[in-house]
Amino acid sequence: MSAYHSLCEIVSEISLLTSTEAVLSWDQETYMPAKALDFRASQMSYLTGKAHALLTSAKTRKLLDRAETEMPETPSQAANVRGLRRDIERAKKLPAKLVQEESETATHAKAAWVEARAKSDFSMFAPHLEHLLS
């Protein structure tokens, strides 16, 4: 199997993780009981961490190096390889722990924003925003 096709399998796995995050996020906004927030934040953090680890893994980087040296078959494949290189370079700059903490904080912040907006009380959301921006 070519390096490009092996990369496609990894990207598919990352897509499964991120699309699962999207479903959990939608559930949080529509049906999730408020008492499930802490567990949902842990779920989101876990999935985000797994996707980040997979994207920045040594295996993925080695396959990308190989895919760049093997001539991609089509212009779209070449664009995919360039885009993946950009994504990996960006992701490598962020420590895994920070990525997971940001995900967990954002999940809590989203719930706080909904409550603060319903009560027209921004002070309920301010600490979450401050933490996200720090």
Residue ranges and their predicted role:
Residues 1-134:
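A well-structured
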